[in-house]
Amino acid sequence: HGCKGDDFCDGDKDAIGRIAEYEASVGVTAIAPATMTLPVEELEQILHTAAEYKKETKDCRKADFLGINMEGPFISPAKKGAQDARNILPCNVEICDRFLKASEGLVKFIGIAPEESEHAAEFIREVHERVNVSLAHTNADYDTAMEACRAGANHAVHLYNAMPAFTHRAPGVVGAVFDNKDVMAEIICDGIHIHPSVVRATFQMMGA
């Protein structure tokens, strides 16, 4: 989302540049910043600004800007975390395409909570060849998450956080990810969001 006092959703090219320069200074060579759940029109402007930054910036001192990870607005109010519930929407193909257009194809991941729409599988089938679909900020149970994966969801963020806990009787989204080898998972390895033991176990199960 950001660092050093700058946020990707500031919608400011200079802020993106400072983020990219800081990341490069600590060894991160490429970034795909995440958005917050904001009004659609505001997100479109942020995405447009990012596309302009990408076209204008050729600086080896900055991390390469690979794309954008949209954590919202198609998420669950029950797992919204720091997101503003007033801006949460059910997944919508037209709005998704607006995001892709505004970003000039820079949006690489779009997060959804599949339990929040009876048309989630249809949405995934419609868009998954244009953008990677993530299970994100979701309260889905195992069966709902499995249906989303079968429809074409191929990514989960951030595994264990902002989703149901993994238990032996209710494996939830985490269990569905473990059961789908084509699904890539992102995890927050700061030792706070997830216990280091769980990070190690996840790498043992899923690999790098």
Where do the language-model regions lie?
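Charged helix-capping and loop-helix junction motifs
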Residues: 12-15, 46-49, 92-94, 169-174
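Active-site-adjacent C-terminal substructures of enzyme catalytic domains
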Residues: 144-208
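Active-site glycine- and acidic-residue-rich loops that bind
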Residues: 40-45, 115-120, 133-139, 186-204
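Divalent metal-binding pocket/active-site signature
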Residues: 70, 77-172
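Di-metal (Zn2+ and/or Mg2+/Mn2+) metal-binding site signature of metallo-dependent hydrolases
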Residues: 1-13
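Metal-dependent catalytic neighborhoods of phosphoester/phosphodiester hydrolases
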Residues: 41-52, 81
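Short helix-capping segments at alpha-helix termini
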Residues: 55-62, 103-105, 128-130, 206-207
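Divalent metal-dependent hydrolysis catalytic cores, especially in the metallo-beta-lactamase
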Residues: 4, 17-46, 62-76, 103-115, ...
